Swiss-Prot record:
Organism encoding this protein: Gluconobacter oxydans (strain 621H)
BP GO terms, sorted: translation
Family per record: Belongs to the bacterial ribosomal protein bL32 family.
Name assigned to this protein: Large ribosomal subunit protein bL32
Gene Ontology CC: one annotated term: large ribosomal subunit
């Protein structure tokens, strides 16, 4: 069975873990209602995406409308 030959130093351990940090989640302002939402996602407050209503307001994702692309 493979066993480490030497103890991993705190510096080397920290360098290995340097890419595991969590980043700040991006948010954008909804162009319809002004609430904060995630980029490229339907607004959970008003149901608009890309300037048109995709989800009926207050349905929380149930009953998606068929969006007609203009």
């Amino acid at each position: 069975m493979a066993v480490p030959k030497r103890k991993t130093t705190p510096s080397r351990r920290g360098m290995r873990r340097s890419h595991q940090a969590l980043g700040v989640e991006a948010h954008a302002e909804c162009s319809n209602c002004g609430e904060m939402k995630r980029p490229h996602h339907v607004c959970s407050h008003c149901g608009h995406y890309d300037g048109r209503e995709v989800v009926a307001a207050g349905n929380s994702g149930k009953g998606l409308k068929t969006a007609v692309r203009a």
